[in-house]
């Protein structure tokens, strides 16, 4: 798939093998995995990072295959999932860091263009999440509220 804000082609990636049952080499049970997810969520880790840690350190190829639930749904049940979705939160963090950079370097025009692209992507995501009722209908993005949410 092509990149959003450039004329370049995207890079191809590998696909995960199609599995319907848990591999026999997975040593952790579903309860152990859920406890580990809750423990890492208490430490403040995001669901994508938790999934990578479980894959790389504990040998769990797919949490959903073992437990029947995704990492984010396990975090929601335990009460550790944020009210703002993670992809939107990460984009807001990126926009705030870029704004801080532009305060110190106001003539950096390339970063100014990058900030506009990031914020347009944030607005598109907010529109999507408002339509799917993940965010309230009155929720608006502004750099000041984003700074308060992230910090």
UniProtKB/Swiss-Prot annotation:
UniProt superkingdom: Archaea
Matching InterPro entries: Ribosomal_uS15 (IPR000589), Ribosomal_uS15_arc_euk (IPR023029), Ribosomal_uS15_N (IPR012606), uS15_NS1_RNA-bd_sf (IPR009068)
Residues covered by region (Disordered): 1-20
GO cellular component terms, A-Z: cytosolic small ribosomal subunit
GO biological process entries: translation
SUPFAM superfamilies assigned: S15/NS1 RNA-binding domain
Pfam families: Ribosomal_S13_N, Ribosomal_S15
PROSITE patterns reported for this sequence: RIBOSOMAL_S15 (PS00362)
GO molecular function terms noted in the UniProt entry: small ribosomal subunit rRNA binding; structural constituent of ribosome
Repressor listed as a keyword: no
Subunit structure: Part of the 30S ribosomal subunit.
Name under which the protein is recorded: Small ribosomal subunit protein uS15
């Amino acid at each position: 798939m092509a990149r959003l804000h450039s004329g370049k082609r995207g890079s191809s990636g590998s696909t995960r093998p199609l599995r319907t049952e848990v591999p026999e080499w997975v040593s952790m049970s579903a309860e152990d995995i859920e406890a580990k997810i809750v423990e890492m969520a208490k430490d403040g880790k995001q669901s994508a990072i938790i999934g990578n840690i479980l894959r790389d350190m504990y040998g769990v190829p797919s949490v959903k295959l073992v437990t029947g639930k995704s990492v984010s749904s396990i975090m929601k049940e335990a009460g550790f999932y944020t009210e703002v979705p993670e992809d939107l939160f990460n984009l807001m963090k990126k926009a705030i860091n870029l704004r801080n950079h532009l305060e110190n370097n106001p003539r950096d025009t390339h970063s100014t263009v990058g900030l506009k692209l990031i914020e347009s992507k944030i607005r598109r995501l907010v529109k999507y999440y408002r339509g799917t009722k993940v965010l309230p209908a009155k929720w608006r993005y502004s750099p000041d509220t984003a700074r308060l949410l992230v910090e």
